A protein has these predicted regions:
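Residues within well-ordered alpha helices
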Residues: 120, 168-169, 183, 193, ...
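Glycine-rich beta-to-alpha transition loops that act as phosphate-gripper elements at the mouths
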Residues: 76-84, 183-187
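Small-residue-centered hinge/linker elements
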Residues: 1-74, 82-172
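Well-ordered beta-strand positions
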Residues: 95-96, 156, 182, 186, ...
Length: 213
């Protein structure tokens, strides 16, 4: 189950395990987390995170749901295996982040993959006629390579989403924007190194986080 009560306490535990948008269903988890906001029987929330990330939009939806809970209850995050990219994005909504020393965190960045099947389609003799209303309407089309202007547009989108990610980390971790950009190389790091960078509060296991909250 993605949600449970910790032992006999009034602490809810939400398991964010898997890819956000795949194993972690956005609408299901958002509804589940939102339901905790006004639940008087629940006094705190722990996010049990083991996720490499996933959908940027999905991460933002869940992040906002967690923030609504955090407005009235303590929210802690515990990274057991990996809390990278969108997984770390969610952790930043918590007031405190715990992680196993060997857990992987970070991967602060954005990636977009655009398949290009132009050569394959030519090889098998398939061609496309494209009718469109604007210059960039088919800029995601897999049947051709992007133009220089389209590549600039794509990079602009990536940069904008990345700026938002940096702002979330800077705000959630009380770090300077410039410092976050220095560590936001897209790489993962151990929680030990993350603690040295201010991306993790405490090294420990789930029991440590539970006792603290």
């Amino acid at each position: 189950m993605p949600i449970r009560l910790a032992q006999r306490s009034r602490i809810a535990v939400v398991e964010i395990h898997g890819v956000i948008g795949n194993q972690v269903k956005i609408s299901e988890f958002a509804h589940m987390i939102d339901s905790l906001s006004n639940n008087q029987r629940i006094r705190a929330l722990i996010l049990d995170i083991d996720s490499p990330g996933g959908s940027a939009t999905g991460s933002e939806v869940l992040y906002r749901s967690i923030q609504r809970v955090a407005a009235s209850k303590p929210v802690y995050a515990y990274v057991r295996g990996i809390g990278a990219s969108g997984g770390y994005y969610l952790a930043c909504a918590a007031s405190k982040i715990y992680a196993l020393p060997t857990a992987l965190i970070g991967s602060i960045g954005v990636i977009y993959l655009r398949p290009i099947l132009e050569q394959l389609l030519t090889k098998v003799g398939i061609d496309f006629s494209v009718y469109k209303s604007g210059e960039f309407k088919d800029m995601t089309g897999f049947w051709r390579s992007p133009t220089d202007r389209e590549s600039q547009k794509f990079q602009g989108l990536i940069d904008e989403i990345f700026d938002n990610f940096v702002a979330v980390v800077a705000d959630g971790r009380s770090l300077d924007d410039s410092f976050v950009r220095k560590v936001a190389t897209g790489e993962v790091m151990t929680a030990q190194r993350g603690k040295n960078c201010g991306l993790v509060d405490e090294l420990g296991d789930f029991k440590d986080a539970l006792e603290d909250v």
